[in-house]
């Protein structure tokens, strides 16, 4: 009930889930580098010896395989300088299309694709953070729930020993009036009642405070905190009978390494760095591109030579080589260093996960044994207290001995509550160490 409330409406977990929106937005922004671009220009010279009017519009499409394709239309009218005759077109203008493709650098990867792939991996990287938040919050909510249950048990114990003293008051009064015991016995019992009422008030305080703390995790469908009431308390659960000879389950460590989000996060971080390394290696190659264009003027010829009326096809090669390649080599060295650092951190985290699981297993096992022994102590203490009360009624004991026996029984009962709380906390620790709550089961 409490865990379902946390997974449904806890604000911190909801805030973590918005990381998905952030990552999705970054991925969309990276994909925007492949958007079709519309370009246009208008360049006019209405005054002067040469009056020229030039207008152009075109489309530019970056290709996912590298390079780009382009197409456009332009028209140039007026009296052009002799050295700018290529700006002039036939009366209907010029249509042009072409493609530029990489032959060495940017064939398998380029800056656009590297950014897109890194953003895609970054979107996956948001999930481990959400899972880590979920594990932590489930653990904290489990702690808060069992602390509230334990506070309720402590209140019941304190209330029970108070009623024992109150019920005994009438019997002691009648015995004093009959002259069987001295009057200070009645006064001492009144003192004991006052003391136990004070302890009950303190137990009530702890119960109310733990209920308020639990309301942080227990929320209604609208996400508003709900403070649980005392009538919603249930008895604190007893653990199964422990097996002191039960060996450490190594499969738990294997399961934790599969389920813990830290390992998944390292995997996606490594993929992002591998993309960066591939792009750095790509930059070590010469920039060698091929381009093919075709252009066709339409309309009335702009000159008697009709030199713009034929279909024009151009093919070209473009080469650019950074001699030292320091930018590429420097990036490669930096990324390789990051990969080595990430691998070292991953090994340490794996060791810590194994330690977490083993420590949680030990904690759960020993707390189970502690519960069993404490439960035995409670039974024996209650038996002694009941016998001492019988002796008091028979005149074979005094109030001091009864008080001590009841105090020992109450302390034993409280120790059992503490042991049970420790057990349930250890159980939550083991689930957290295993990463069992990383993914919600639909």
Q: Residues of each region from the PLM?
A:
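Bacterial Sec-pathway N-terminal export signals of envelope proteins
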Residues: 1-54, 99-120, 131-134, 145, ...
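Amphipathic alpha-helical coiled-coil segments
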Residues: 3, 13-30, 133-158, 167, ...
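Small/polar (Gly/Ser/Thr/Ala-rich) solvent-exposed segments
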Residues: 38-52, 66-90, 94, 98-132, ...
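Transmembrane beta-barrel architecture of outer-membrane proteins
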Residues: 52-54, 94, 143, 312-314, ...
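Outer-membrane beta-barrel architecture
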Residues: 58, 98, 276-279, 318-320
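Short, solvent-exposed, mixed-charge loop/turn linkers that connect secondary-structure elements
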Residues: 182, 186, 201-252, 287, ...
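Heptad-repeat coiled-coil alpha-helices that serve as dimer/oligomer scaffolding interfaces
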Residues: 188, 195-198, 202, 411-414, ...
């Amino acid at each position: 009930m409490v865990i379902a409330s946390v997974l449904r409406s806890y604000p911190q977990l909801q805030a973590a889930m918005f990381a998905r929106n952030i990552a999705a937005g970054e991925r969309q922004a990276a994909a925007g580098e492949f958007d079709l671009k519309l370009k246009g220009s208008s360049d006019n010279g209405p005054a002067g010896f040469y009056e020229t009017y030039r207008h152009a519009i075109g489309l530019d499409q970056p290709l996912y395989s590298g390079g780009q394709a382009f197409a456009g239309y332009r028209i140039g009218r007026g009296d052009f300088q002799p050295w700018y005759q290529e700006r002039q077109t036939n009366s209907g203008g010029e249509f042009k299309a072409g493609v530029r493709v990489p032959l060495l650098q940017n064939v398998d990867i380029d800056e656009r694709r590297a950014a897109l792939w890194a953003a895609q991996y970054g979107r996956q990287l948001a999930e481990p953070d959400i899972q880590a938040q979920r594990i932590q919050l489930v653990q904290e909510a489990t702690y808060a729930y069992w602390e509230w249950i334990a506070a309720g048990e402590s209140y019941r114990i304190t209330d029970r020993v108070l009623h024992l003293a109150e019920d005994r008051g009438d019997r002691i009064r009648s015995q004093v009036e009959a002259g069987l015991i001295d009057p200070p016995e009645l006064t001492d019992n009144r003192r004991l009642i006052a003391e136990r009422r004070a302890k009950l008030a303190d137990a009530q305080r702890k119960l109310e405070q733990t209920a308020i703390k639990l309301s942080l995790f227990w929320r209604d469908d609208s996400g508003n905190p709900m403070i649980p009431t005392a009538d919603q308390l249930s008895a604190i659960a007893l653990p199964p009978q422990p097996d002191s000879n039960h060996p450490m389950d190594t499969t738990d460590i294997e399961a934790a390494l599969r389920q813990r989000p830290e390992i998944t996060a390292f995997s996606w971080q490594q993929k992002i760095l591998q993309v960066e390394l591939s792009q750095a290696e790509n930059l070590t190659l010469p920039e060698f591109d091929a381009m093919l264009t075709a252009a066709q003027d339409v309309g009335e010829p702009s000159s008697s030579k009709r030199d713009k009326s034929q279909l024009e096809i151009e093919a070209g090669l473009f080469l650019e080589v950074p001699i030292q390649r320091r930018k590429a080599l420097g990036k490669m060295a930096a990324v390789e260093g990051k990969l080595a650092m990430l691998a070292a951190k991953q090994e340490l985290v794996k060791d810590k996960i194994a330690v977490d699981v083993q420590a949680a297993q030990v904690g759960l096992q020993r707390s189970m044994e502690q519960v069993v022994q404490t439960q035995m102590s409670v039974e024996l203490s209650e038996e002694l207290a009941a016998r001492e009360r019988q002796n008091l009624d028979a005149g074979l004991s005094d109030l001091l001995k009864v008080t001590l026996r009841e105090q020992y029984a109450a302390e034993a009962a409280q120790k059992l509550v503490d042991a049970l709380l420790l057990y349930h906390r250890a159980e939550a620790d083991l689930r957290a160490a295993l990463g069992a709550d990383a993914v919600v089961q639909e």
